[in-house]
Amino acid sequence: MVRIAFGSIGDSFSVGSLKAYVAEFIATLLFVFAGVGSAIAYNKLTADAALDPAGLVAVAVAHAFALFVGVSIAANISGGHLNPAVTLGLAVGGNITILTGFFYWIAQLLGSTVACLLLKYVTNGLAVPTHGVAAGLNGLQGVVMEIIITFALVYTVYATAADPKKGSLGTIAPIAIGFIVGANILAAGPFSGGSMNPARSFGPAVVAGDFSQNWIYWAGPLIGGGLAGFIYGDVFIGCHTPLPTSEDYA
């Protein structure tokens, strides 16, 4: 059963919620600054050469490390979403209300945009790369790729962070989330760019003024994240039986 809740203005504007929005803004800004910054650095060091295997690994590792840190520094305040697709997936499973999730989206999009504006400034106007599908692929193929890899990301978020049965597994949630993002960039980077995150794609599109393929990075991640939220949050967690207690073995 889907457990979506709209929420209330009072809850979404509580002190705790306002702190969460600020935490999402800061963490997303730092993540995008490092992630997009690694792509800009690669282009500068190679004189805008085509991405090679070593460059792909470097960009994937930068995103994985940055997300690991971003989730870690925001986890105790906002849950460490840093991604509208993660927020939607958690909303589908009843872990955050729609209204509060909407303000998370705003914070994440603003964080990404400010990060890219800062990168544009500190690099003295170097081009901010945007996501786009590879030559020879169409938009639908890009959407399907983003659905699959975002599903993997949000499924990992549920398994390691949101599942009430996670136990000690929760301690590795940030690094597991960073690992799946890095792995997915290695797999999907040469094809769709491996975004998994509408905010990660939105900021560069704003600063570059190029929204020609940005819809792909909204449609794919939101579908994939929502599907993972439904399957894990509503089907699996919704059917959980209580964990056995010590008395059950007495």
Curated annotation (Swiss-Prot):
Keyword Repeat: yes
Chief site of localization: membrane
Motif position, NPA 1: 83-85
Keywords for this protein: Membrane, Repeat, Transmembrane, Transmembrane helix, Transport, Vacuole
BP terms from Gene Ontology: water transport
Name of the protein in its database record: Probable aquaporin TIP-type RB7-5A
Regions that span the bilayer: 20-42, 55-77, 97-119, 140-162, 172-194, 215-237
Membrane topology listed for this record: Multi-pass membrane protein
Functional description taken from the UniProt entry: Channel protein in tonoplast. These proteins may allow the diffusion of amino acids and/or peptides from the vacuolar compartment to the cytoplasm.
PROSITE patterns given in the database record: MIP (PS00221)
Family according to the record: Belongs to the MIP/aquaporin (TC 1.A.8) family. TIP (TC 1.A.8.10) subfamily.
GO molecular function: water channel activity
Pfam families on file: MIP (PF00230)
GO cellular component, one term: plant-type vacuole membrane
Intervals of motif NPA 2: 197-199
Matches recorded under Gene3D superfamilies: Glycerol uptake facilitator protein
Tissue distribution: Roots.
Annotated localization: Vacuole membrane
Recorded domain comment: Aquaporins contain two tandem repeats each containing three membrane-spanning domains and a pore-forming loop with the signature motif Asn-Pro-Ala (NPA).
Signal peptide per UniProt: none
